[in-house]
């Protein structure tokens, strides 16, 4: 009878449906399988797997607050996986900070007013940030101003400068100069060669002049014959 009772208890304990068998097997496996964390604490594998999956889902959504709402095992599992996620989030934040800083720099550069003509080259040196202009004829104007000041202090010099002759002599003066030169050359040639170059005829003197070109009438008579 004892065997019968034991066998009946075993038959009653054995589940009939496959789902019940699977649940019983899972419970048996979970009761005997543990995971050892880095902290040295042993956590059931089923709880750690459930916590890790929930943590991964929440990390994909971008939040870490959901890990604290789970059990202690899931929170520790989350904490064990947190260094990589925190490093990635910190890197993203650093990248965003760098982008923001660069963007701000570009905005400041775009808002900064243009310098325009604030850069001037003076004798090979670049002077920035100062608006300067050089006049092209500043030296000549200074010299003219100095001469004007000298003329004011010396009236005689100013009068002499006003009486200066023009650069080109007048036409009458040129004609008189060449007329005198031609007359002197005519007299010299007449006295030396007894010939008047102005009238183109010989004069009385030591030389006897003969025409080299025949007369026009004589040449005409010769051609007619």
UniProtKB/Swiss-Prot annotation:
Residues 71-82 have a biased composition (Low complexity). GO terms for cellular component: nucleus. The keyword Membrane does not apply. GO terms for biological process: regulation of cell cycle. One of its GO terms (molecular function) is cyclin-dependent protein serine/threonine kinase inhibitor activity. Coiled coil: none annotated. Keywords: Protein kinase inhibitor. Residues 55-67 have a biased composition (Basic residues). It comes from the Eukaryota. Residues 47-94, 130-169 are annotated as: Disordered. Residues 143-153 have a biased composition (Basic and acidic residues). Belongs to the CDI family. ICK/KRP subfamily. This is Cyclin-dependent kinase inhibitor 3. The gene is KRP3.
């Amino acid at each position: 009878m004892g065997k019968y009772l034991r066998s009946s208890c075993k038959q009653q304990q054995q589940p009939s449906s496959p789902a019940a068998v699977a649940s019983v097997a899972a419970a048996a496996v979970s009761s005997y399988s543990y995971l050892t964390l880095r902290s040295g604490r042993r956590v059931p594998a089923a709880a750690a797997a459930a916590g890790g999956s929930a943590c991964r889902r929440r990390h994909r959504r971008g939040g870490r607050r959901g890990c604290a709402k789970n059990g202690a095992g899931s929170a520790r599992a989350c904490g064990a996986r947190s260094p990589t996620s925190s490093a990635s989030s910190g890197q993203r934040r650093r990248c965003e900070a760098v982008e923001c800083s660069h963007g701000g720099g570009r905005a400041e550069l775009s808002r900064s007013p243009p310098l325009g003509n604030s850069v001037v080259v003076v004798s090979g040196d670049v002077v920035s940030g100062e608006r300067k202009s050089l006049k092209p004829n500043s030296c000549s104007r200074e010299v003219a101003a100095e001469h004007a000041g000298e003329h004011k202090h010396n009236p005689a010099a100013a009068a002499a400068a006003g009486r200066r002759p023009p650069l080109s002599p007048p036409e009458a003066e040129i004609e008189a100069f060449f007329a005198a030169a031609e007359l002197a050359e005519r007299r010299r040639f007449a006295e030396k060669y007894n010939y008047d170059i102005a009238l183109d005829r010989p004069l009385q003197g030591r030389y006897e002049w003969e025409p080299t070109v025949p007369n026009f009438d004589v040449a005409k008579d010769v051609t007619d014959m």
